[in-house]
A protein has these predicted regions:
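Hydrophobic, lipid-facing positions within transmembrane beta-strands of outer-membrane proteins
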Residues: 122-130, 172, 271, 331-335
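Terminal intrinsically disordered/low-complexity segments used for targeting and assembly
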Residues: 2-67, 124, 148, 232-277, ...
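Short sequence motifs at beta-strands and strand-loop junctions characteristic
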Residues: 118-122, 327-329, 430
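Periplasmic alpha-helical coiled-coil/stalk elements that build and connect Gram-negative outer-membrane
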Residues: 140, 156-271, 382, 406, ...
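Short flexible linkers and secondary-structure junctions
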Residues: 17-169, 306-311, 344-351, 358
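Sec/SRP-type N-terminal targeting helices
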Residues: 73-74, 90-91, 134-162, 212, ...
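A short glycine-centered flexible hinge/capping loop motif at secondary-structure junctions
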Residues: 204-208, 411-415, 452, 456
Length: 474
């Protein structure tokens, strides 16, 4: 009983409200990212980021995915569901009113002595009833607030899905663009090697070259053709992936990347301390912590009594003609207090479970926040590395191409064997393809950075009941 009294006093002194515990800040260490061009500068708005690549088909594909992707539709349905459940929780704060009209017609036996003046009787009754639970300890308001946090979490989860889908579309499309470049490079190499094979065959027939040179040239041509087949397979797989992302069957989907060069934008990352407010997944994790903290507060109110007010009223009469007369009216008022005296430890277990749930949500929140910081830093690391690779492979591509031309000229004059030509040609092709792959990796790393920075998302400024009407266009 002393424990119950203490809980009652705590509930009264706490102004009868339940609020989530404030989140402790996540330590970010040094408030700057490595490889950031302007470490102290704020990150620019990323709204409309797909257009920054300067490719209209990319923007159109992202818009199509945001409109047709089924993962996004499922996430939107979860928001609608959370809003509906919020309505259920908020309804508990209002009184319930009901009506139970009835009509009975009965006949009394004529062979049994009774004092009733009539053997055939009618009973008309229309009683109304109302009940209202007084939210003394904030349990119902706390439960409604849990529903609001769930709506905000579902809305942030939807934004995270939209961002994931948009960036996956961008990554696959950009990869497809560079695969097309790779295919063009391989096609040129195959044409050159086919021509070289014809020249060598003529030299063999003239006795100026050996069969070994012809065999090496044929093997080199077949290797390039095998690489071409593999790149074509990759192109088809990317088109299929884009089809599914846009909500279309792969059997009826086509896409043709523009032939123009992709413009890879520079994306300043801003400050680590600001990043956590820009990520929808971090925001959703924080709302899960708030909801779990509220669950703990609501669970503790189970130790406190509940007060319910009831009221009845209406009319009842044997004759329909006198049904609405004053003497036919009836009413009643009441109040009840309920308190559980023994439940075998159920309430203690519920509080312990809710407390553990709060600790779990808090740990997940911190892991999500640290993961967000890592994703930004990893993307910056990739961008720095790919920029360096592009410089090196660009120089290597020019050098190896010149070496390949020189080697072919030397072979034509009989100064070197065809093995040297093959090696030089292979080096030139590898350098060209590595340059393409590095440019592709730079574009993908930039998309990864956009995703890691939240893609221009901002926390909702509207009520939870209206989050479905938010404009989340990228």
């Amino acid at each position: 009983m002393s424990r119950l009294a203490a809980l009652l006093a705590a509930g009264l002194l706490g102004a009868c409200t339940i609020a989530p515990q404030p989140l402790a800040p996540v330590p970010v260490g040094t408030d700057r990212f490595r490889h950031a061009d302007a470490p102290g500068a704020p990150a620019p708005s990323l709204a409309g980021w797909p257009a920054s690549f300067g490719d209209a088909p990319l923007v159109a594909l992202v818009d199509a995915a945001l409109a047709g992707n089924f993962d996004i539709r499922a996430a939107a349905a979860r928001v609608d569901q959370a809003q509906a459940l919020l309505g259920v929780r908020e309804a508990a704060l209002s009184p319930t009113v009901g009506v139970d009209p009835s009509f009975n017609r009965s006949r009394v036996s004529g062979t049994v002595d009774n004092a009733l003046p009539k053997r055939l009787m009618h009973n008309w009754s229309v009683p109304f009833n109302a009940s209202y639970e007084v939210d003394l300890w904030g349990r119902l308001r706390g439960d409604a607030e849990i529903g609001r946090q769930n709506v905000l979490q579902a809305d942030a989860d939807r934004a995270a899905v939209r961002l994931r889908v948009a960036t996956e579309v961008a990554s696959d499309y950009l990869t497809l663009h560079f695969v097309e470049e790779d295919l063009a490079t391989l096609a040129r190499a195959i044409e050159l090697r086919r021509t070289a094979l014809d020249v060598i065959a003529a030299r063999v027939r003239a006795g100026a070259a050996s069969d070994l040179d012809a065999l090496r040239a044929a093997a080199d041509l077949d290797t390039a053709r095998a690489d071409l087949a593999d790149s074509r397979r990759l192109r088809e797989n990317l088109v299929d992936a884009l089809a599914v992302l846009t909500g279309v069957s792969p059997t009826s989907f086509t896409v043709a990347p523009t032939a123009a060069a992709i413009r890879v934008p520079a994306v300043p990352p801003g400050l680590p301390s600001v990043l956590l407010a820009q990520r929808p997944d971090v925001y959703a994790a924080a709302r899960r912590v708030d909801a779990a903290s509220l669950e703990t507060g609501v669970a503790r109110t189970a130790w406190l009594p509940t007060l319910t007010l009831t009221a009845q009223g209406g009319f009842a009469s044997r004759d329909l003609g006198s049904f609405l007369e004053r003497n036919s009216s009836l009413w009643g008022l009441g109040a009840s207090v309920a308190e559980t005296l023994f439940d075998g430890g159920k309430r203690d277990a519920a509080v312990a479970a809710a407390t553990a749930g709060t600790a779990l949500a808090d740990a997940n929140y911190r892991a999500t926040a640290l993961g967000a910081l890592r994703e930004v830093q990893d993307a910056l690391n990739d961008i720095a590395a790919q920029n360096e690779r592009i410089v090196r492979y660009d120089s290597a591509a020019r050098s190896t191409e010149a070496a390949a031309r020189l080697s072919l000229s030397r072979y034509a004059h009989g100064y070197v064997s065809y093995l040297e030509v093959i090696d030089a040609d292979r080096d030139a092709l590898n350098a060209q393809r590595q340059l393409i792959h590095s440019r592709q990796a730079l574009a993908i790393a930039t998309v990864d950075l956009v995703r890691a920075l939240g893609g221009g998302w901002t926390p909702p400024s509207v009520a939870p009941q209206n989050v479905a009407q938010r404009d989340d266009r990228l």
